[in-house]
Amino acid sequence: MSNVNNAMAQGPTLQVELTRQFDAPVARVFKAWHDSVDVKRWWQPDGFTTPVANMNFKEGGKSLLCMRSPDGQDMYNTWTYSKIVPNERIEFVLNFSDKDGKAFDPAQVGLAGIPKDVRHVITFKSLGANKSEITVTEYGYTSPEVVEMSKAGLIQCINKMAAIVQ
């Protein structure tokens, strides 16, 4: 089963919220968020690859990921985890970074509307033995255009995740 709800913008800053159901156990979907082999297969929009997914999946840990564009440009992000409840919830802050994990303001590279710290909350819900649902929420955007760009990329990523876990 594949259900995707539309993203929405709310409040003084804007957020992206995406809910998706999977024909897979919640533990398998949760694993896809922290297993480096899985993350390399789904954490990129169409046409991109993820050559680096150095996962340090623990509260206080920081993962380093790299998306490579079709023309070979590398874009690094870190995920710094503040809360992990197995099979229930992951909270992290995404930062754009250099290849060494040093964060920078996305506006410095022409990405106005993306905050330096993009808070992510992923909730997981079991819908039965082989069915689950996640909701991904990204917080802090200041531009409706960036919300739409992030939503489009997130939908592509989560569709790739579905192909892996189902």
Give, region by region, the residue ranges found by the protein language model:
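Beta-strand/loop substructures that line and gate deep hydrophobic ligand-binding cavities in soluble
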Residues: 91-94, 101-155
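Hydrophobic pocket/interface hotspot
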Residues: 29-32, 39, 63, 81, ...
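A short, structured loop/turn motif at beta-sheet edges
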Residues: 26-28, 56-58, 82-90, 123-133, ...
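Hydrophobic ligand-binding cavity/cleft-lining segments
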Residues: 1-50
